[in-house]
């Protein structure tokens, strides 16, 4: 076709050189390069081509079917950022997934994404929380009869697979879990009343003088602290005691570990710690705690036992099926006495168990009526502190209802009782012993309750309710709730007591969801 101006037609298509300089050419060239590269990678090499082809054929023949299974696991949560897969953080699921791949239970093609395998957990545990038993459901290659042992070979000692059971394709371990058992280990010295002259001790004393709603006199705790006072009087002069009480740690640059005053303070704390660990709970004190825990049985509105939930939110109603508190037992070189609390509930909200334990323990510490707990289910907002995560562990999910359907389908039921002996041994070595040791090394529970005993700041709104301010939305501190006779604790406290105490040693982190207040106390462990 003519392209000169005389014809009235101008060729608007670029020439070869102009085309090669354009963006479209560069993009097309890049695509061709990618195509050629892929084609080259797929083409068997000319040398040893028979081996390459044979290898490809063998890989296709070795491809095995995936089966939907329930994997029963146990783990120690220390050192992990919880159960749920959350890269780049180190989690339990990340360890399990890697072990599945290394053992051949998950193919390399499916080793990059949990979703490809239908990964789901029955109960998500938070940072530092352990599980004697938990269940995950996913698709695995289980043709190898020794697959469980191979998986365990690739797992650290603190994570174990108890069993692998075939389930039907519709199985969802979280949705079909009928209920869950949790256990909480608590040192009995947590039940001792607050140390004399702390804010909480003065508040209880003030309530004891009130005409109504006063707590019972806690003679057991008074005798305990009187015995400690006598031991201190024998060890230190009054001048030394005053210096110890008023001791303020110097800056790191000025700190002298060999100073006489610091050594006195250290001796005093060691005496107090040893005296506390020698405590043995009385039957009356333990009975009060057991009665407090019984208040949780049945369906209740637990909106005060979690975060961000309103009284009218229907999801806050939870059903507790059974609660047991063991007899006291003594563990470890320090001869600390403990109790085990087991809670069986249909489901639990964030922090719920730790707040339940905290409330019941404070009932015992304040020696007030266990029936106060029943009033926490009402619309009044209460700021309940979380007990340390250290003592919490998931005992096991329960599939009582769904196990009947599994039997009908010809599958084995999901029952942790088949592995109870192995689980008990594992818990003693990898969970219980670590809990006991960490409590002794860090004084976790002592730091937590000392912080509450000393902190007097009322959280939430203060002042008289107005027409535009619902009194139920005025957030009470846990102390104001348990001891309503202390109507104005700030007015009755000394100037020194009104100062917020220092955070327990070893904890300087405050999460966004847990403000540093009198009742949301930072602990040395994270949530459960």
From Swiss-Prot:
GO terms for MF: metal ion binding; pseudouridine synthase activity; RNA binding; snRNA pseudouridine synthase activity; tRNA pseudouridine synthase activity
Reactions it catalyzes: a uridine in tRNA = a pseudouridine in tRNA; uridine in snRNA = pseudouridine in snRNA; a uridine in mRNA = a pseudouridine in mRNA
Enzyme class at the top of the EC tree: isomerase
SUPFAM superfamilies attached to this UniProt entry: Pseudouridine synthase
GO cellular component, one term: nucleus
Coiled coil: none
Main location: nucleus
Locations listed in the record: Nucleus
Segments of skewed composition (Basic and acidic residues): 31-46
UniProt entry tagged with the keyword Zinc: yes
Gene Ontology annotations of biological process type: mRNA processing; mRNA pseudouridine synthesis; snRNA pseudouridine synthesis; tRNA pseudouridine synthesis
Active-site feature positions: 126
Domain of life, source organism: Eukaryota
Keyword Metal-binding assigned: yes
Similarity comment: family membership: Belongs to the tRNA pseudouridine synthase TruA family.
Function: Formation of pseudouridine at positions 27 and 28 in the anticodon stem and loop of transfer RNAs; at positions 34 and 36 of intron-containing precursor tRNA(Ile) and at position 35 in the intron-containing tRNA(Tyr). Catalyzes pseudouridylation at position 44 in U2 snRNA. Also catalyzes pseudouridylation of mRNAs.
The protein's name: tRNA pseudouridine synthase 1
Annotated source species: Eremothecium gossypii (strain ATCC 10895 / CBS 109.51 / FGSC 9923 / NRRL Y-1056)
Classification of source organism: Eukaryota, Fungi, Dikarya, Ascomycota, Saccharomycotina
Gene name linked to the record: PUS1
């Amino acid at each position: 076709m003519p392209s000169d101006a005389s014809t009235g037609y101008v060729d608007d298509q670029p020439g070869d050189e102009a085309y090669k300089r354009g963006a479209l050419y560069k993009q097309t060239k890049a695509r061709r390069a990618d195509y050629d590269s892929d084609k080259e990678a797929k083409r068997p090499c000319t040398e040893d081509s028979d081996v390459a082809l044979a290898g490809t054929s063998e890989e296709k023949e070795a491809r095995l079917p995936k089966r939907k299974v329930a994997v029963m696991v146990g783990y120690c949560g220390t050192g992990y950022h919880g159960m749920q897969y959350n890269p780049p953080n180190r989690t339990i699921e990340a360890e399990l997934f890697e072990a599945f791949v290394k053992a051949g239970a998950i193919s390399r093609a499916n080793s990059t994404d949990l979703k490809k395998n239908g990964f789901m957990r029955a109960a998500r545990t938070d940072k530092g929380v352990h599980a004697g038993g938990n269940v995950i459901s996913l698709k695995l290659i289980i043709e190898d009869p020794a697959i469980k042992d191979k998986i365990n070979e690739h797992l650290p000692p603190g994570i174990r697979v108890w069993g692998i059971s075939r389930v039907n394709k519709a199985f969802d371990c979280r949705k079909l879990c009928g209920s869950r058992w949790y256990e909480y280990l608590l040192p009995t010295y947590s039940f001792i009343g607050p140390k004399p002259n702390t804010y909480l001790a003065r508040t209880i004393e003030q309530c004891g003088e009130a005409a109504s709603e006063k707590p019972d006199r806690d003679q057991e705790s008074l005798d305990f602290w009187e015995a400690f006072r006598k031991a201190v009087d024998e060890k230190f002069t009054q001048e030394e005691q005053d210096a110890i009480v008023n001791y303020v740690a110097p800056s790191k640059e000025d700190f002298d570990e060999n100073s006489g005053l610091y050594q006195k303070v250290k001796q005093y704390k060691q005496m107090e710690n040893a005296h506390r660990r020698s405590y043995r709970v009385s039957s009356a004190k333990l009975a009060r705690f057991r009665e407090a825990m019984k208040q949780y049985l049945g369906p209740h509105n637990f909106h005060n036992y979690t975060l961000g939930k309103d009284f009218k939110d229907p999801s806050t109603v939870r059903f507790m099926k059974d609660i047991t508190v063991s007899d006291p037992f003594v563990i470890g070189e320090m001869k600390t006495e403990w109790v085990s609390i087991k809670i069986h509930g249909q489901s639990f909200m964030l922090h719920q168990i730790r707040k339940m334990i905290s409330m019941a323990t404070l009932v015992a510490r304040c020696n007030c009526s266990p029936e106060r707990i029943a009033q926490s289910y009402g619309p009044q907002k209460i700021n309940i502190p979380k007990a340390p995560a250290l003592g919490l562990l998931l005992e096991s999910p329960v599939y009582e209802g769904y196990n009947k359907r599994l039997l009908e389908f010809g599958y084995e039921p999901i029952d942790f009782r088949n592995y109870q002996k192995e689980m008990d041994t594992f818990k003693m070595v990898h969970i219980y012993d670590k809990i006991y040791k960490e409590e002794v090394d860090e004084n976790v529970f002592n730091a937590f309750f000392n912080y509450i005993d000393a902190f007097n700041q009322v959280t939430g709104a203060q002042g008289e309710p107005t027409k535009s301010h619902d009194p139920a939305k005025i957030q009470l501190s846990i102390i104001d709730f348990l001891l309503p006779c202390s109507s104005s604790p700030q007015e009755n406290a000394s100037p020194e007591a009104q100062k917020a105490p220092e955070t327990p040693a070893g904890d300087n982190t405050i999460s966004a969801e847990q403000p540093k207040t009198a009742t949301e106390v930072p602990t040395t462990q994270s949530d459960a």
